Structures are given as structure tokens and as C-alpha cells.
Amino acid sequence: VYPHQNPGIGPNKYNFDENVRYELHVSLGSDIPLGRPTVTYRFEFQTKFKSQKTLLQSYLGVIQNIDDAAQNLTQTYTITKIDNRLGTTSQIGTGIVPPNNQGNATPFYNEGDNGENPARKGVATAAELDKYTRQAIFTFPNGYTAFAGQRDDGFVGDIQSIFDLLKLRNPGQDAQGGFNLHLMALRVPRSELGGDQQTVGVFATTSRLMMPVSNSNGRGILDLIRRPTWVQVARQGNPLFNE
């Protein structure tokens, strides 16, 4: 979510929205042609401040470990599994969102563990990941692994040529190169999807709480009344084909 995050936005910071349900839907068997979710994995986020008596909203100093005293604004998340075949809901686990890359406040994201250097390049193994990312990969019972946080946008597409120029360029250009996004990743056991060599459908949705406006108090003042009803506001399937 939140693509095209400019790394050089200074003190501004992107966060997950705690008023949004982020859901990953998996369709199996006869649910695939209907686009109907067989199993849904829901991410919900909570935001906490260690201190509200400061102008330094996000960081109070150099962060040595995720969720330490210097990471003032900290987000946690809960992952819930909804099995629509059985009508059951179960909690998979909870995790912590690592800090965004903020230069000197988060030095371990950068080359040589120096916040003034460029960000580390991509790696091939988990052992090569930076310290914050390693700490933010959570393993849960029954074979689940999850991560949620800021990452380099891995989607490659020549957006300008497709939408602006209406023709393909050779060679193409990576329109997302150098920009970040907020990623939610969940590894599930193959047995949960029916084993090896399965055809599955996957799509994602975001939903918000319905928030109607009412001025029934008779004082000419608009009141926001939050109802416990979730409304889907976005759906993402195959990028550039079903969005």
C-alpha cells in the first residue's frame, strides 16, 4: 500500500492506517471462477506513542532495535484467519512494524550501518538482511511467517509508456524504481492451500468503517457518527489487468 513513497521526504512519515482492514483473499477449487474467497487473512494495525510530550513524533534518537525507547511511534498488528468454508475465525499472531528508513535515526538500513550512506542493496538470504528487518520477521505456530513494513517497491512496470504514451518503449523503464511502499507479507503452509501443484486465486481488499455525517443535534454542528460497519473501498487483483 501507499506506493511511490519518496525516500527524501524528510520528517514526513507513512504509516499503516489503524482504521483500515487490509485483507488477503485466497480462492480454492470451485471458488476460483467465482472470485469468491475461500480463506481470508486479515491485517489490523494499532498505533502507540511511548511519549506524547515531544515534538519528535516518530523518533526520539537513534533506534538500535525495533520498538526500543527511541522508536516513539510504534505500530503493531494482528493477523486473523477467516475460513469461509467452516465459518471460523482464528488469530494467527501479532507482530511489530519496524521503523521507516529515516537516515541517521535508523542507521542499520544503510550501507556500513551508517545513516548518511545509501540504503543497502537487495540481498539473497535472510541472514544478509539488515538488523531491523530481521527483527521484524515473525514466525507463528502452524507454519506461518509474517512481515509488515516499508520496503522498496518490487513491482516493475513502464507506467509512463503504458498510460501516458500509449505505447511500449524498448528498453522499458522501471517507473517504481527508487520509490518505497508499505508491504504486508504472509507465508502460509502449502497444506493449507491443498498441497503442491495447486491452482489458486489471490486478491487483496481494503475496507474502512462507515462514517456517516449527522447534524441532528439541532445546533448546526456536524457530528461524525462511527458505525461498526466495514465497507470495502479498494480491490487489487492482477496488477495492470484487474485493479
PLM features per residue range, with description:
Residues V1-E243:
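Surface-exposed extracytoplasmic segments
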